[in-house]
């Protein structure tokens, strides 16, 4: 097994640590590197409207560099996922910060969401990450009528138009994630609309393996249809019923088929494991060591599939 291969895992924040935002994350970064990982996906604050100050962005860049890690991706915030450190003190309505929404029809609110997205793009640029992963929320009602489509795409296109130059100037792409609130056909329609309007140096796909298994069990049409736009991955496993976010091979996903499908694209490895350690009873260091062995296994599967295709 080639232990020198690039590997990537998501770094999370664990609010049980009094200073999770610096000492806690720094400790996790050190353990991730000690386990053998070379890259991270930066996830803290991905579910909140928290705006990072310039000093925080620089601090984040520094602690990742000091840990000897590179950043493969940053999870951006769409502003409407009601998670913030305020809510941990006891959820109350005013603590649910969901006002910065780049899909809002209230233009002040949409513009606020654009500012939040630009903030995460700036973080990615500082970290040297090539993309930010973004949730674009759709449902199965989105494509039932032209009116419903316009309700989504009018603010979506305005917001993406507003951030396009910001992204291109910083060499940061937006990777739109495969989610679970609509069927596979409708996510393919979403990507088709986006890719007919925006170039590949701006917008691509984040393939979330667990999410896609839930909406299209045993199939990989998003990779087959839009593999040329694959720029980010969220790799995790489940049993087909819940979004478990397990390590690969701990659920039912067909990793041979998945790695072959990814290998057939121009995706730049490493794969990113989006697998929080709270699914396991292991210590943090033991968890990362186990995850790294599995990450190496998947990287070798992708590399082998590419070698076979080339020969």
Curated annotation (Swiss-Prot):
Pfam families named in the record: AP_endonuc_2
Entry keywords, A to Z: Plasmid
Keyword ATP-binding among record annotations: no
Database matches in InterPro entries: IolE/XylAMocC-like, Xyl_isomerase-like_sf, Xyl_isomerase-like_TIM-brl
Domain of life according to the entry: Bacteria
Name used for this protein in its record: Uncharacterized protein y4fM
Organism this protein belongs to: Sinorhizobium fredii (strain NBRC 101917 / NGR234)
